[in-house]
């Protein structure tokens, strides 16, 4: 199977799969991919994410000098939440589109489970490894945007912990950070426990008992 290119000037996506009709958008840049990638209008991007109109994304970096692709990254749509979209400053009054507000996609704010490299450092990854990571990432698919945000934020906290075995208290240490990200929720610790249970049910952590957990192999 292969993906096909949409006709020009389509506002949402660049490619589609003729078998399953899934859509993909490509963002590319010369040089290192970096932590963020420029996108279009901020309000449009937020509307797409919250309205479940976002395609899956490919991010590509290339070397114009060496005429080669250096990195090619796949990020499924269900890893997109408003928190990873960074609002840029409005264009100056002297600009042709004065006041227009663009955005950046903060790919460094996406959990590692959602950043799937097809090419890394100029080397193509094994297809079996890519398929395994995509299938595993699909377990994190959550339609409700608020529930998705909580699950991915707690997953990022777990990812930040050193080692494979950790305690509930270790995750509670992120209570302040999670409270800032979700100010409408005043019961952060119960929410943390709920997300850990979901991550266990989805196969990303094991519960060892007595408030202890273990990260599962990727």
Label for each model-derived stretch:
Residues 20-39, 44-54:
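Short metal-binding segments enriched for Cys and/or His
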Residues 170-174:
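A short acidic, leucine-rich amphipathic alpha-helix
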Residues 2-8, 27-31, 208:
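Short Cys/His-rich "knuckle" micro-motifs
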Residues 70-153:
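Long, low-complexity, charged/polar intrinsically disordered regions in eukaryotic proteins
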Residues 190-218:
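Charged low-complexity interaction tracts in eukaryotic proteins
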């Amino acid at each position: 199977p292969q993906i096909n290119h949409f006709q020009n000037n389509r506002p949402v996506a660049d490619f589609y799969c003729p078998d399953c009709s899934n859509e993909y958008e490509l963002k590319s840049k010369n040089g290192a991919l970096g932590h963020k990638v420029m996108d279009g209008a901020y309000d449009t991007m937020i509307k797409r994410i919250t309205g479940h109109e976002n395609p899956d994304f490919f991010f590509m970096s290339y070397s114009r000098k060496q005429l080669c692709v250096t990195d090619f990254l796949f990020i499924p749509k269900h890893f997109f939440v408003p928190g990873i979209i960074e609002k840029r400053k409005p264009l100056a009054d002297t600009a042709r589109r004065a006041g227009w507000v663009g955005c950046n996609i903060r790919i460094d704010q996406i959990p590692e489970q959602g950043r799937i490299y097809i090419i890394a450092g100029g080397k193509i990854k094994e297809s079996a490894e890519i398929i395994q990571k995509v299938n595993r990432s699909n377990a994190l698919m959550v339609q409700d945007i608020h529930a998705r945000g909580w699950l991915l934020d707690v997953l990022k906290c777990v990812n930040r912990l050193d080692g494979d075995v950790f305690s509930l208290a270790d995750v509670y240490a992120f209570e302040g950070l999670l409270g800032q990200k979700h100010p409408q929720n005043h019961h952060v610790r119960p929410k943390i426990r709920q997300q850990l249970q979901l991550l266990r049910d989805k196969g990303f952590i094991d519960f060892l008992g007595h408030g202890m957990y273990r990260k599962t192999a990727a």
